[in-house]
Amino acid sequence: FLWGALIKGAGKLISRVVGSLKKKKQ
């Protein structure tokens, strides 16, 4: 199982969600 790919995908998803949340707050 490729844990590195999974972690990379999760990181991208989390950063995307955090970015959208920051935009909504502004």
From Swiss-Prot:
Chief location bin: secreted
Record InterPro entries: Antimicrobial_4
Protein name: U1-poneritoxin-Ni1b
Pfam families xrefs: Antimicrobial_4
Family to which the UniProt record says this protein belongs: Belongs to the non-disulfide-bridged peptide (NDBP) superfamily. Medium-length antimicrobial peptide (group 3) family. Ponericin-W subfamily.
Tissues expressing the protein: Expressed by the venom gland.
UniProt keyword list: Antibiotic, Antimicrobial, Fungicide, Membrane, Secreted, Target cell membrane, Target membrane, Toxin
An example molecular function term from Gene Ontology annotations: toxin activity
Keyword Zinc-finger on entry: no
A GO cellular component entry from the record: other organism cell membrane
Record keyword NADP present: no
Function: Has a broad spectrum of activity against both Gram-positive and Gram-negative bacteria and S.cerevisiae. Has insecticidal and hemolytic activities. May act by disrupting the integrity of the bacterial cell membrane.
Subcellular location: Secreted; Target cell membrane
BP-aspect Gene Ontology terms: defense response to bacterium; defense response to fungus; killing of cells of another organism
